[in-house]
From Swiss-Prot:
Protein name: DNA-directed RNA polymerase subunit beta
GO biological process: DNA-templated transcription
UniProt cross-references to PANTHER family, sorted A to Z: DNA-DIRECTED RNA POLYMERASE I SUBUNIT 2
Record function comment: DNA-dependent RNA polymerase catalyzes the transcription of DNA into RNA using the four ribonucleoside triphosphates as substrates.
Encoding gene per record: rpoB
Originating species: Lactococcus lactis subsp. cremoris (strain SK11)
A single MF term (Gene Ontology): DNA binding
CDD domains: RNA_pol_B_RPB2
């Protein structure tokens, strides 16, 4: 027997064909959301307050300090927030201290700071009763970047950009003449030496001494001449910079100093964030530039004075390991004193080392670094500017390397915690201005922290973020996998990201650093391709937001691959050689072969086993969770794998789902981490189980009660239903699944079913990927799902009085009211059809003032019945089903309703959707199709033992699509079902051809795994043997019930009077210009005229046509289309004199052609009001007769 058994959870064992030992399990799959939010609550929120406070008044006499904050218990639980359309949030109270510096008086006060959104255990937020989540964002990391540019003449030059988290950009560039320029915040450029002079290095000699002599530097100095002898070089430079930043304003050296400080050196205006400082120091550190260079000075141990490395030594990896600790401890540090009139006249600490230029071995180049400032330093420093210029000058000498912005070392994830932190910062900075103004304008004696603080900017900022940000999304709740995928998704779009229209091919493309960090498969098809991505299955995000991938460390001394796992970021991984996960190992964890396939900076190379530094932990670390659920993914073309991964997320939860016979081993953890299953919070013993709750007695003696969710409407309109899995008396551990969620079976994800599939054609019904299906799948409810739709009706106060929910509805018979209760609301369990009443509601009509006679009669006989109109809620087209739940919200019950609303009624209608022709089906390999025919079981082809086939697929769908995985799944699935075993075949480490044939043989199937099929209609065998097996097939959310639509009489557009379009508006089908051309080509003049008049926007004509049809008369000639009048009016509004003439050249007045003016019958006699009444009576009679006939049929 090939393979070995592995237990997944408590309820499923699978035979696994994996050969590679997995050293670590998958991490918690939603920790990217939960950890980020936890860090925000623990540290991030307090950090924002500490950044913003204390706040002083303008005079400096008062100060408002932040002391601390406390979150109180939430008003609603998660379930209550859902039911009440509320937010799941907790009130936050912040303690402030107001210090009066003149008197020393302290006032401490706790201030309510609004309700703060809380994350549920599943990583989502409840906002206005609906479940939303914050998608992480992939953005450029702040830092120092260098790039190579080629101009149109083919000349190469280097550029530099300093990107902060917040603040002005600083750029360096070279022109065609070889002069270097600096550009501050995208303004006009000026020579880069001007910036150095402004920092306090006024003379040419000082600059040359600092940076060393290079061609670019000497050429630029020659261009940068002293223009105004009245100013020092430093002052002149400062004024030049001011002139670029504020052209036209009077300039002084002092104002320029203030401006430069505000742009780059002021923490309020400029912020690198810790990640920016980390990236900056890493880029500019000398140790990262020295490898491969020759030293032009000896390296001396500062403590002993011993020469460790001599001059003219080539820096190898070993030499670098020797001098790296010394560089980190300040070797080569020196201090320069800028002139007194510099921007910041303080000593500047730099670090230097001299090397020979790779382009000219005689020339010495001085490399400068910024002295590695502390991570607390979050502004640009003069040392940073000088080091940047030094690095940039060095690039022309072949020292240092340019950056690739698409490298994942230069792009980082902004998760929910950081995004929320930014919103709070925006709110607080708006609040800061208000506080300062109030401090300065108020009387000092009576002022309190509460009086200074207005929390509206903060609450508005958070509310706006959750309500309308591009990154705050309505959660995809089709099934557990779509939930999980949505939580692990990250987007390059959104505020601060890139725009869809300007995204280049490079940004969207797969990059070598995506390996083990970002899935190369799972991304949308269409305009967002490559901009929205998913986290790979083992990936984690570090404190700076960089994605890390795990690797097993190789002990190179002993040649052993250890079980010690290290998480590396993309730029750390570039320094190492990483062996593939499928490299064969001996029993004592050594490489079995002399050489191994490995990766180094994006190259796949064969290296000696002794040179590998790390080894992949698992073959599936490359791809995301959805792709890892596709068996035999390695045998599918990548385009089809992308479709397969994306379509699994569209699977509809079925009423009786089954886990796949052929899985990948990912099904259990995906189901557990998705949030759809019910997990035990503590270990214990199950004391009680029923359909609604499970009680678990903890080992400590306490009782945990778990409520099971039954048939709740999900965000996608599907049924969210949990079923108990735990049994009475069963022992459960923490995080065990005790109830299956939707699309789950026995603790595993179960998106579809395992039908018997044959690859064969049948009467052409599976042409173009169509699917032929057996009637058994309908009779046995194999692919039946439940759709739940929500309808609501509210009563408001109108000018004429309040609306009412009631049974007393004008002109509605008892038959229509039979399912309403005494208050006029439908009863739960009632079966309703299109147009049936759900909530009876009446609205007051406008009444004219009564005449004196009427007033007299009312006084004698009492008040007559009020005039009301029927505004009841009815079942829309295609919405019929069974009333599953009714919820009534009123203020008396303590529900929060919008102003003007007195009562809100919500009705949920459930529909049982059996599969039928037009529904979309798919396998897991991107093989999708539409059900084209449902064949009686007796007509389906059958196996020699009489078993009829369930589904027939077109064999031509396989070769051109190159998704051979489906064929392998088919054969192995048949063997698995025959043997009664579930199988796990992990991606890139699954069943080989030999394993499949061995299992087929074990199951006693034919050697070619094919079979003879017999035609169910004739009993004759088909000519050739046919591939038959078990394949996992899912029903997708694109159901024909949601799409099929036909209009009878419906609404019209106000302006053009043409029917609306679309199913939601009960609209018609557009007869567009191409269709008109077709009729014109056939000369079908009458049909064309009808379509352009009666059936479109001839208002009078359609009324007359209706009347003529009802009376059985000839249909009259059409009138003037409304859109023609609109066109005339539009032309007149442009000042063009448009007149309309009849056939005899008489001018027609369009107003006279209005319905009110002339309304004639076909014989040109005028229509009177009496005639219209008679017409209405005829119509009413015809409708009554029709209803009577229908009722008679029903009785029959």
């Amino acid at each position: 027997m090939a393979g070995h058994d592995i237990k997944y959870g408590k309820h499923r064992t699978r035979r696994s064909f994996s050969r590679i030992k997995e050293v670590i399990g998958l991490p918690n799959l939603i920790e990217v959301q939960t950890l980020s939010y936890k860090n925000f609550l623990d540290e991030g929120l307090a950090n924002v307050f500490k950044e913003m406070f204390p706040i002083d008044n303008f005079a400096g006499t008062m100060e408002l300090e932040f002391v601390g904050y406390e979150m109180k218990t939430p008003k609603y639980t998660v379930e209550e927030a859902r039911a009440h359309d509320a937010n799941y949030s907790a009130p936050i109270y912040v303690t402030f201290r107001l210090v009066n510096k003149e008197t020393g008086e302290l006032k401490t006060q706790e201030v309510f700071f609004g309700d703060f959104p809380l994350m549920t255990e599943m990583g989502t937020f409840i906002n206005n009763g609906s479940e939303r989540l914050i998608v992480s964002q992939l953005v450029r990391s702040p830092g120092s970047y260098f790039h190579l540019k080629t101009d149109k003449n083919g000349l190469e030059s280097f550029g530099h950009t300093t990107i902060p988290n917040r603040g002005a950009w600083f750029e360096l560039d070279t022109d065609a003449k070889g002069i270097g320029y600096v550009r501050i915040d995208r303004t006009r450029k000026l020579t880069f030496t001007t910036m150095l002079r402004a920092l306090g290095f006024g003379s040419d000699d000082e600059i040359l001494e600092l940076l060393g002599e290079t061609q670019l530097l000497t050429d630029t100095i020659a261009k940068d001449v002293h223009k105004n002898p009245a100013d020092t070089r430093v002052e002149e430079a400062l004024k030049d910079i001011y002139d670029r930043l504020r052209p036209g304003e009077p300039k002084t050296a002092d104002s320029s100093r203030g401006l430069l400080v505000a742009r780059f050196f002021d923490p309020k205006r400029y912020d690198f964030a810790p990640v920016g400082r980390y990236k900056f120091n890493k880029k500019l550190a000398l140790k990262n530039r020295l490898l491969g260079l020759t030293l032009a000075e000896p390296i001396v141990d500062p403590e002993t004075g011993e020469i460790l490395v001599n001059t003219d030594t080539l820096v190898t990896r070993d030499v670098l390991d020797l001098i790296e600790p010394l560089l980190d401890n300040g070797l080569g540090n020196f201090v320069v004193e800028p002139s007194d009139d510099a921007v910041i006249p303080e000593p500047i600490t730099l670090q230097s080392i001299k090397v020979y230029s790779p382009k000219d071995s005689e020339r010495v180049v001085t490399l400068l670094s910024n002295g590695n400032p502390d991570s607390e330093c979050r502004v640009l420093t003069p040392a940073d500017v000088i080091s940047n210029i030094s690095y940039w000058l060095g690039l022309a000498e072949g020292i240092g390397k340019v950056d690739d912005i698409d490298h994942l070392g230069n792009r980082r994830i902004r998760s929910v915690g950081e995004l929320l932190q930014n919103q709070v910062r925006i709110g607080l900075s708006r609040m800061e201005r208000v506080i300062r103004e109030r401090m300065s304008s108020s009387e000092n004696e009576n002022i309190t922290p509460q009086g200074l603080i207005n929390i509206r900017p903060v609450t508005a900022s958070i509310k706006e973020f959750f309500g309308s940000s591009q990154l705050s999304q309505f959660m995809d709740q089709h099934n557990p996998l779509s939930e999980l995928s949505h939580k692990r998704r990250f987007s390059a779009l959104g505020p601060g990201g890139i725009s869809r229209d300007r995204a280049s091919y490079e940004v969207r493309d797969v990059h070598y650093t995506h390996y083990g960090r970002m899935c190369p498969i799972e991304t949308p098809e269409g305009p967002n391709i490559g901009l929205i991505n998913n986290l790979s299955s083992y990936a984690k995000v570090n404190e700076y937001g960089f994605i890390m991938s795990p690797y097993r460390r190789v002990d190179r001394v002993n040649g052993i691959v250890t079980d010690e796992v290290e998480y590396l970021t993309a730029d750390e991984e570039d320094n190492y050689t990483v062996a593939q996960a499928n490299s064969p190992l001996t029993d004592d964890s050594r490489f079995a072969n002399e050489t191994v396939m490995a990766r180094h900076t994006g190259n796949n190379i064969e290296v000696e086993a002794s040179t590998a530094d790390y080894m992949d932990v698992s073959p599936k670390q490359v791809i995301a969770v959805a792709a890892a659920c596709i068996p035999f993914l390695e045998n599918d073309d990548s385009n089809r794998a992308l479709m397969g991964a994306n379509m699994q997320r569209q699977a509809v939860p079925l009423i009786d789902p089954h886990a796949p016979w052929i899985g990948t081993g990912m099904e259990h953890q995906t189901a557990r981490d998705s949030g759809a299953a019910l997990l035990a919070k503590h270990a214990g013993v199950v004391e009680y189980v029923d359909g609604n709750e499970i009680r678990v007695r903890r080992t400590s003696g306490e009782l945990d009660i778990y409520n099971i969710t039954k048939y709740r409407r999900s965000n996608s309109g599907t049924s969210y239903n949990q079923r108990p899995l735990a049994r009475l008396g069963e022992k459960v551990e923490k995080n065990d699944i005790i109830a299956d969620g939707p699309s789950m079976e026995n603790g595993e994800m179960a998106l579809g079913q395992n039908p018997l599939v044959a690859y064969m054609t049948w009467e052409g019904y599976n042409f173009e990927d169509a699917v032929i299906m057996s009637e058994r799948l309908i009779k046995d409810d194999v692919y039946t799902s439940i759709a739940i739709e929500e309808y609501e009706s509210e009563t408001r106060d109108t000018k004429l009085g309040p609306e009412e929910i009631t049974r007393e509805i004008p002109n509605v018979g008892d038959e229509a009211l039979k399912n309403l209760d005494e208050s006029g609301i439908i009863r739960i369990g009632a079966e309703v059809k299109d147009g049936d009443l759900l909530v009876g509601k009446v609205t007051p009509k406008g009444e004219t003032d009564p005449t004196p006679e009427e007033r007299l009669l009312r006084a004698i006989f009492g008040e007559k019945a009020r005039e009301v109109r029927d505004t009841s809620l009815r079942v829309p087209h295609g919405g019929g089903g069974i009333v599953h739940d009714v919820r009534v919200f009123t203020r008396e019950n303590g529900d929060e309703l919008p102003s003007g609303v007195n009562k809100l009624v919500r009705v949920f209608i459930a529909q049982k959707r059996k599969i039928h022709v037009g529904d979309k089906m798919a396998g897991r390999h991107g093989n999708k199709g539409v059900v084209s025919n449902i064949v009686p079981v007796e007509d389906m082809p059958y196996l020699p033992d009489g078993t009829p086939i369930d589904i027939m697929l077109n064999p031509l769908g396989v070769p051109s699509r190159m998704n051979i995985g489906q064929v392998m799944e088919l054969h192995l699935g048949m063997a698995a079902r025959t043997l009664g075993i579930h199988i796990a075949t992990p991606v890139f480490d699954g069943a080989s051809d030999e394993d499949i044939w061995d299992t087929v043989k074990e199951a006693g199937m034919a050697a070619d795994a094919k079979t003879v099929l017999y035609d169910g209609r004739t009993g004759e065998p088909f000519d050739n043997r046919i591939s038959v097996g078990v394949m996992y097939m899912i029903k997708l959310h694109h159901m024909v019930d949601d799409k099929l639509h036909a209009r009878s009489v419906g609404p019209y557009s106000l302006v053009t009077q043409q029917p609306l379009g679309g199913k939601a508006q009960f609209g018609g089908q557009r007869f567009g210009e191409m269709e008109v051309w077709a009729l014109e080509a056939y000369g079908a003049a009458n049909v064309l005229q009808e379509i352009l008049t009666y059936k479109s926007d001839d208002v009078i004509g359609r009324t007359r046509a209706y009347e003529a049809i009802v009376k059985g008369e000839r249909i009259p000639k059409p009138g003037l289309p409304e859109s023609f009048r609109v066109l005339v009016k539009e032309l007149q509004s442009l000042g063009l004199d448009m007149k309309v003439f009849d056939a005899d050249r008489n001018v027609l007045d369009l107003r006279e052609l209005d319905e009110d003016e002339v309304m004639t019958r076909p014989d040109n006699t005028e229509i009177t009001p009496e005639m219209l009444e008679a017409q209405e009576a005829i119509v009413a009679q015809a409708e009554a007769e029709e209803e009577a006939l229908i009722n008679a049929d029903i009785e029959k």
